[in-house]
Amino acid sequence: MKVNQYEPIPQPEELEIREKEDAMGAYLMMFAALGAGLPLPILNLVAAIIYYYINKGKSLFVRFHSLQSLLSQLPTSILNAVAVFWGARIIFFDYAFTDVFKGYLWLVGIANLIYIIFSIIGAVKARKGEMYYFLFFGRVSYQSVFKKKEEGAHKAMVNQPPKM
């Protein structure tokens, strides 16, 4: 007999509108952070981390979408940060504007476009109360959020007198 090791996935009709909106906000929040943090791409990542920690206790549905949004933002934030600092180095320290840098900018642009498309799809699906799994990050988020916790894992410590 196989025991299910994951919590049941909530269905759209079981979710409150507020949960759907909070899950959608995990994906759309990056657009607001993008406007404020365009020259500093790490601000998007900081905003995603804050959003996750604020909303992780609301429901498994919101926590899943917040974590998936956060994890999927990690690679693009790193790519963007490298592009910004590499570009600043070229501008301020008279390094050459090479074909390698141009190719890297194309890579960063394509990665950001893919991230934006997936984020919009994820936001629409979350607003409908549906689960949407990104290629790698969806599985990691699902396993992290929906895995059942062992009941004996968090035993309370017993107070003891000091050793004599």
Regions found by a protein language model. Give the residues of each.
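Membrane-interface extramembranous regions at the lipid-water interface
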Residues: 2-37, 43-71, 122-164
